[in-house]
Structure formats: C-alpha cells, structure tokens
Amino acid sequence: MSSIIPAPRPLNALAFLACLAAIVGALYLQHVDGLEPCPLCIFQRVGVIAGAVILLIASLHGPKNIGVRIYGALTTLAALGGGAVAARHIWLQNLPADQVPACGPGLDYMLEVFPLQNVLQQVLAGSGECAEMDWSFLGLSLPGWSMVVFAGLLLVGLIQMFRPLTR
C-alpha cells in the first residue's frame, strides 16, 4: 500500500497548492465577482490558510518520521476545525426559511466591539447572510466546496500521521 502513497514532501506540496488554489478562487469570487464573504466563510478561509501554512512549512522542512506525523496531526486539526465550520454553514443553508437566524453585524464590527469569545459564539451561531446560497458549482455551494477541501486536507493529514516509518 505504501508504494501508492507519495512521499511526504511532494504530498504536502501538492496539498499546499490545492489550498492555495482554493484561497485564490475565494478571493477571485470576492474581488472580481463581488461575492462578499459572510463570517462563516471567513472562518473557513482561516482554516484553509492554516492548513496551507502547515503544509508549506512541512514541505519546506521535509522532516522524517515523527516530524511527518506531527505535521500530519496539525493538518488534521486544521481540517477538522475548518470542516466543522463548513458543516455548520451547510446546515444553516439547508434550514427552512422560517428557521434561518436574523442577520447580525459584520465580523469587523464584532471584532472591534465584542470580546473574542462572544465573537466566536455569534459567528458559529450563524446569521441570515450565512444561510444565503449566492453561488454554486456542480450542485455544491461554497461551503460544500470548502468541505471538499477540508476532506482532502483530512485525508492528507491522516496519511501523514499513519504512514509507515522509514529508516
């Protein structure tokens, strides 16, 4: 089985490029197509960026055995955190219209006015703008595509954590 698994460094580099493509795509949709991200979208971007940074450092560092596993564990944590936010976002988008939470203040305002813990609670509770589906591709909304990215990150992280040790 290990013969079909790429070496750690190229796998990390490839996953980093996938994260980079996801972020570039999100920025294109925001700045070229005018699709403003909701607070949950911004949190998902943070998850993808965290995964990208971990993968870039891992691919540049090129550690052996325990280092590969540590970077894999960190990648897995980023994927699980981002995936949880994406799952919450997908759930909000699929609520019946009468159960959608009211729109709240923007993330910038909340960060200026409220303590960080309150901001996290309010963002994860969701708001009306997070329930809107303004864009889809192949039947998936942006949070759906984020979930695909996080599933890929999770797979890479688990492969790195449980790959056979080398000498």
From Swiss-Prot:
Transmembrane segments: 12-28, 47-63, 71-87, 145-163
Protein's GO biological process: protein folding
Membrane-side (Periplasmic) residue stretches: 29-46, 88-144
Membrane topology: Multi-pass membrane protein
Disulfide bonds: C38-C41, C103-C130
Any one Gene Ontology cellular component term annotated for this protein: plasma membrane
Keyword Transport recorded: yes
Subcellular location: Cell inner membrane
Entry annotated with the keyword Metal-binding: no
Keywords attached to this entry: Cell inner membrane, Cell membrane, Chaperone, Disulfide bond, Electron transport, Membrane, Oxidoreductase, Redox-active center, Transmembrane, Transmembrane helix, Transport
Main subcellular localisation: membrane
GO molecular function, one term: protein-disulfide reductase activity
Pfam family, one: DsbB
Record-stated family: Belongs to the DsbB family.
General function of this protein: Required for disulfide bond formation in some periplasmic proteins. Acts by oxidizing the DsbA protein.
Protein name: Disulfide bond formation protein B
Organism name: Alcanivorax borkumensis (strain ATCC 700651 / DSM 11573 / NCIMB 13689 / SK2)
